[in-house]
């Protein structure tokens, strides 16, 4: 994929902050549009099903699930992490993805690892919502990202002084 100099620069910055490869970063007009494309691909590859998410979220994080033809399954939130409680997660049925939302910028690697394990054991993907902590991701002990897909928002109300944008 051909990138402009500015796109390559942002991909390099995101990669350096997260310990990932710049080639793995894709810029989008809004993070929710990147989420929509990812959920549409999940639907195309895995078929109809559910995405585990939480009520403590924004409608812009749920709309892409619905637009892609998937169904949100609202889950219990952990008091300690403000994300889906991995112990309470019902991973049965037609689960296609689990959203690890780092609410308030809380990135708990151990809790995310447990959530990733539950998702993967169910044959689902772990989708990481880093809208509140752009440039940070949950990682395993070796420093590798735990999520299969990670979204970062550059929206006006987020951490960066931009009007629009996001990265997948």
Per-range role (PLM):
Residues 80-168:
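Active-site phosphate-binding strand-loop segment of PLP-dependent enzymes
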Residues 25, 72, 126:
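Hydrophobic anchor at the start of a short beta-strand
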Residues 38-92:
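Conserved PLP-anchoring active-site segment centered on the Schiff-base-forming lysine
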Residues 15, 65, 117-119:
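A generic structural signal for well-ordered alpha-helical segments
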Residues 23-25, 48-51, 165:
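Short active-site oxyanion
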Residues 1-33, 41, 56:
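Conserved N-terminal alpha-helix of the aminotransferase class I/II PLP-enzyme fold
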Residues 3, 7, 11, 58, ...:
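A structural signal for well-ordered alpha-helical scaffolds and beta->alpha junctions
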């Amino acid at each position: 994929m051909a990138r402009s100099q500015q796109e390559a620069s942002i991909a390099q910055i995101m990669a350096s902050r997260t310990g990932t490869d710049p080639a793995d970063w894709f810029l989008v007009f809004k993070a929710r549009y990147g989420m929509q494309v990812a959920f549409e691909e999940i639907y195309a590859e895995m078929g109809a099903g559910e995405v585990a998410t939480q009520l403590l979220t924004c409608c812009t994080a749920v709309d892409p699930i619905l637009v892609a033809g998937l169904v949100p399954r609202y889950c219990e939130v952990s008091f300690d992490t403000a994300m889906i409680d991995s112990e309470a997660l019902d991973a049965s049925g037609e689960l296609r993805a689990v959203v690890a939302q780092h609410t308030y910028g809380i990135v708990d690697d151990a809790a995310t690892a447990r959530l990733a394990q539950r998702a993967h054991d169910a044959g689902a993907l772990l989708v990481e919502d880093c809208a509140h902590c752009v440039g940070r991701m949950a990682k395993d002990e070796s420093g590798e990202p735990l999520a299969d897909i990670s979204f970062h928002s550059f929206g006006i109300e987020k951490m960066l002084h931009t009007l629009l944008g996001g990265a997948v």
